[in-house]
Regions:
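Residue-level signal for inorganic ion chemistry
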Residues: 42, 69, 99, 117, ...
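A short acidic, helix-capping loop that chelates divalent metal ions and anchors anionic groups
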Residues: 76-80, 84-86, 144-149
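Conserved nucleotide-sensing/catalytic segment adjacent to the nucleotide-binding pocket
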Residues: 85-116
Length: 193
């Protein structure tokens, strides 16, 4: 039996390569539907579900068809998204392959807007890579999820990454009442409120 010193790194790289191939194949089939939608991501420790849901409901009430991706449910207009299996969604923010499929279904259904929760885990694991965001919203940052991030600095960096990847034409909205609010939107390419 051959033993490699860095077997964990080799496996991690293989998984990354395999994931990239899977995403590439998905994009060949579906294209990048997020480019044809106005996708607004909401990140923060608390308030993601409420904020995304309210934006979805308000936009729908104004006569625009929108989608919602979050912890509680995924909605395409007012219809609940039917996953490929009967299992519930495993995380707040689905992986990039699943997101591409969901965005494609939303686009086919006539959605103009998508409001989605963007978790720190998703940002750290690059689950929103390639999503063309029209805007990003920061709610707050508290000392939750430190089991995953180890300390508040790592948690902050994971959330901040979201605002650094927003395109120039997007917008950033940050809660200035939160002690991390102003720092969260530094080093961004888009306008911030």
């Amino acid at each position: 039996m051959i033993k490699y010193k860095n077997m964990k790194n080799i496996i991690k790289k293989f998984k990354s390569i395999w994931w990239a191939i899977k995403l590439f194949a998905t994009r060949i089939h579906y294209g990048n539907p997020s480019k044809k939608l106005k996708v607004v991501g909401v990140t923060g420790t608390n308030g993601k579900t409420t904020t995304a849901t309210l934006l979805h409901k308000i936009t729908t009430a104004l006569g625009h068809k929108s989608g919602l991706i979050g912890t509680v449910e995924i909605l395409i207009g007012e219809e609940k998204f039917k996953a490929d299996s009967n299992k519930p969604m495993p995380s707040t923010t689905p992986d990039s392959v699943s997101l591409t499929k969901i965005f494609a279904k939303m686009l086919t259904a006539g959605c103009e807007y998508v409001f989605m929760e963007v978790s720190s885990h998703a940002l750290d694991q690059n689950r929103v890579s390639g999503v063309n965001f029209a805007g990003g919203i920061f709610t707050n940052l508290t000392h939750d999820h430190l089991d995953y991030h180890k300390d508040i600095e790592n948690y902050f960096r994971a959330k901040k990454k979201f605002f650094e990847i927003l395109p120039e034409k997007a917008f950033a909205l940050s809660n200035a009442d939160d002690e991390h609010g102003l720092a969260m939107v530094e080093r961004r390419r888009c306008p911030a409120l």
